[in-house]
Amino acid sequence: MPPSPAVVGRSLVNSFKQFVSKDLHTRHVDATYRLVLDCVAAVDPLMRLYTFGSTVVYGVHEKGSDVDFVVLNKTDVEDGKGGDAATQVAKGLQADILAKLARVIRQKHLSWNVEEVRRTRVPVVRVKGGGAVDFDITAYRRNGVRNSALLRAYFEQNPPCRWLSMSIKRWSKQTGLNASVIGGSITSYGFNLMVVYYLLQRNHLQFVPPSTIDVSRVEPLPPHLPLEEPADEGLELGTQVLDFLHFFLHEFDSDKQVISLNRPGITTKEELDWTKSAEDFARMNGEKVHYQWCIEDPYELNLNVGRNVTPLKRDFLRRHLEKARDTALLTIV
């Protein structure tokens, strides 16, 4: 017998005591942003620096968490609804500008540890010891800015729903489901899409067309969004958590349906041609793509954010969803 919503809520609120006692204001990010912006200007004064990721989505920053930055040129910003090029040429241009930026950062901040990572899907510069905040920098990619702005637009509609998202994100890392953990398969971004999709299906949020998000109208460093403690000793949070788990265990049909914010209502695998035959065809072309747990990216065409979920990992996910129901996302032993 699963615990009641009240018990789940109290347990989760208790588990976040240390988190809410911290200074979660984004002012810590502001200082680092200005230092990095100074380095960007030294490379190219016309370049813009944007923040994306959880700091933008939630409007808070926990000390010790990494921050994501991206450098964009004037054309990227003016064409704020344009798609990101995924060619090898584009990847090379990203790596080149990041190499220049990495050199400037090393010159201006001798104590910072700067690592250039080229052999990834997206080239990135990773910086540790960046003042109070560690950060990653990518280049010429608007999708991260648009994704984060879209998710923030949803959470601004109903700010307390951030607690559901943060609870699911933390649980996903504890269970090893999160791609940030070795063996994990769904990114924090993917779990955020799952949370917002669930909230839309329950009419807790109003649909936001992804096409309305324009980088030219997004603030490079969005302001802090105060985070109030869950009301009613977490009763609403406990209710949402149990219903989220029930939804993905018993209502969402992973064999036929796609988690999608691209359009209202239900999206099917058949509509997107995310079928077993498409999976087999991709494998014949050397691509490791799975359509077992489908999460459609709002901006990157034909991208399944859940592409790393194999049949085995889908079963693993379901077992953890069942266990989460009985343990209040592992907060009740």
Swiss-Prot record:
A GO cellular-component term linked to this record: kinetoplast
Substituting residue 188 to A results in: Severe decrease in UTP binding without affecting RNA binding
- Annotated phenotype, changing residue 300 to A: Moderate decrease in UTP binding
Instruction: Indicate the impact reported for residue 126 to A.
Output: Loss of catalytic activity. Does not affect UTP binding
Positions annotated to bind RNA = 121
**InterPro entries named among the record's database cross-references:** MTPAP-like_central, NT_sf, PAP_assoc
The keyword Membrane appears for this protein: no
Q: Name one Pfam family in it.
A: PAP_assoc
Instruction: Give residue numbers for the site Important for catalytic activity.
Output: 136
* Record keywords: Magnesium, Manganese, Metal-binding, Nucleotide-binding, Nucleotidyltransferase, RNA-binding, Transferase
Q: Which Gene3D superfamilies match?
A: 1.10.1410.10
Binding positions for Mg(2+)? 66, 68
The terms under GO molecular function for this entry are: metal ion binding; nucleotide binding; nucleotidyltransferase activity; RNA binding; RNA uridylyltransferase activity
Cofactor dependency: Mg(2+); Mn(2+)
Summary of activators and inhibitors of this protein? The 3' uridylated RNA substrate is involved in the selective incorporation of UTP; UTP binding is favored due to the constraint posed on the positioning of the NTP base by the continuous stacking interactions between Tyr-189 side chain, the bound NTP, and the terminal nucleoside base of the RNA substrate.
Q: Which SUPFAM superfamilies match?
A: Nucleotidyltransferase (SSF81301), PAP/OAS1 substrate-binding domain (SSF81631)
Quote the annotated effect of residue 66 to A.
Loss of catalytic activity. Does not affect UTP binding
Q: What is the effect of changing residue 148 to A?
A: Severe decrease in UTP binding without affecting RNA binding
According to its UniProt entry, the function of this protein is described as:
Terminal uridylyltransferase which, specifically, catalyzes the addition of Us to the 3'-hydroxyl group of single-stranded RNAs with a 3'-terminal U.
Provide the assembly information.
Monomer.
Q: Which family does it belong to?
A: Belongs to the DNA polymerase type-B-like family.
What is the name listed in the Swiss-Prot or TrEMBL entry for this protein? Terminal uridylyltransferase 4
